[in-house]
Swiss-Prot record:
<dbReference type="InterPro" id="IPR002072">
    <property type="entry name" value="Nerve_growth_factor-rel"/>
</dbReference>
<comment type="subunit">
    <text>Monomers and homodimers. Binds to NTRK2/TRKB. Can form heterodimers with other neurotrophin family members, such as NTF3 and NTF4 (in vitro), but the physiological relevance of this is not clear. BDNF precursor form: interacts with the heterodimer formed by NGFR and SORCS2. Mature BDNF has much lower affinity for the heterodimer formed by NGFR and SORCS2.</text>
</comment>
<keyword id="KW-0964">Secreted</keyword>
<dbReference type="GO" id="GO:0043524">
    <property type="term" value="P:negative regulation of neuron apoptotic process"/>
</dbReference>
<dbReference type="GO" id="GO:0008021">
    <property type="term" value="C:synaptic vesicle"/>
</dbReference>
<comment type="function">
    <text>Important signaling molecule that activates signaling cascades downstream of NTRK2. During development, promotes the survival and differentiation of selected neuronal populations of the peripheral and central nervous systems. Participates in axonal growth, pathfinding and in the modulation of dendritic growth and morphology. Major regulator of synaptic transmission and plasticity at adult synapses in many regions of the CNS.</text>
</comment>
<dbReference type="GO" id="GO:0030425">
    <property type="term" value="C:dendrite"/>
</dbReference>
<protein>
    <recommendedName>
        <fullName>Neurotrophic factor BDNF precursor form</fullName>
    </recommendedName>
</protein>
<dbReference type="InterPro" id="IPR029034">
    <property type="entry name" value="Cystine-knot_cytokine"/>
</dbReference>
<dbReference type="GO" id="GO:0030424">
    <property type="term" value="C:axon"/>
</dbReference>
<feature type="propeptide">
    <location>
        <begin position="19"/>
        <end position="133"/>
    </location>
</feature>
<dbReference type="GO" id="GO:0005737">
    <property type="term" value="C:cytoplasm"/>
</dbReference>
<comment type="similarity">
    <text>Belongs to the NGF-beta family.</text>
</comment>
<keyword id="KW-0732">Signal</keyword>
<dbReference type="GO" id="GO:0038180">
    <property type="term" value="P:nerve growth factor signaling pathway"/>
</dbReference>
<keyword id="KW-0339">Growth factor</keyword>
<dbReference type="GO" id="GO:0048812">
    <property type="term" value="P:neuron projection morphogenesis"/>
</dbReference>
Length: 252
């Protein structure tokens, strides 16, 4: 599982170029790093300049695994520091990592999504086999109340969005960096129009409740242009989840 996760992380970074949003200067190879997430060395800096041509031996693979696990721990710690206390801040969803600047379509979900899954895997590894079987949703026959789909979309798909002041802004498709331009990608989650819950939420007693699966939105930071042609980074709303809404049926 560790090697599989490392392969996913390597492929994730391989399709992405980084560049800091906090500074005007672009460092390194023009990659975009988000606040709270540190940039780390390449595989060459971990295993030496010729590691890629030699291939990974068992010792280098173990060293690489240890290095990535250390990076994962740092990223999770930083995410907890950047993410505000959700109980005291209603705008906590603004800090989700659903935006990426890349030269091509990302091959994986956002990195922090993968980190959370890997963290859950590590937690599950400490359970007994019997507890793991009992906690596995698939073994318990669990189903989602609403069917949803998640995918990367570009500014060409979105075109416009609503910012925090309620105004409509134009989402810029490309972001200039020192060595060219990168596209903005947004990881959106919405209700599946082709799913089995388009007529109502799953598992709801239709005799007493009216139910509907609805797409909800959260704020993410993106490069936009307002009606006065002013370009800047603003928080905009994108689709981030599919939830079930209920209304009680009135007696006839």
């Amino acid at each position: 599982m560790t090697i599989l996760f490392l392969t996913m992380v390597i492929s994730y970074f391989g399709c992405m170029k980084a560049a800091p949003m906090k500074e005007a200067n672009v460092r390194g190879q023009g990659s975009l790093a988000y606040p709270g997430v540190r940039t780390h060395g390449t595989l060459e800096s971990v295993n030496g300049p010729k590691a890629g041509s030699r291939g990974l031996t068992s010792s280098s693979s173990s060293s690489l695994a240890d290095t990535f696990e250390h990076v994962i721990e740092e990223l999770l710690d930083e995410d907890q520091k950047v993410r505000p206390n959700e109980e005291n801040n209603k705008d906590a969803d603004m800090y989700t990592s659903r935006v990426m600047l890349s030269s091509q379509v990302p091959l994986e979900p956002p990195l922090l999504f993968l980190l959370e899954e890997y963290k859950n895997y590590l937690d599950a590894a400490n359970m007994s086999m019997r507890v793991r079987r009992h906690s596995d949703p698939a073994r318990r026959g669990e189903l989602s109340v609403c069917d949803s789909i998640s995918e990367w979309v570009t500014a060409a798909d979105k075109k416009t969005a609503v910012d925090m002041s309620g105004g409509t802004v134009t989402v810029l498709e490309k972001v200039p960096v020192s060595k060219g331009q990168l596209k903005q990608y947004f990881y959106e989650t919405k209700c599946n129009p082709m799913g089995y819950t388009k007529e109502g939420c799953r598992g709801i007693d239709k005799r007493h409740w009216n139910s509907q699966c609805r797409t909800t939105q959260s704020y993410v930071r993106a490069l936009t242009m307002d009606s006065k042609k002013r370009i800047g980074w603003r928080f905009i709303r994108i689709d981030t989840s599919c939830v079930c809404t209920l209304t009680i049926k009135r007696g006839r």
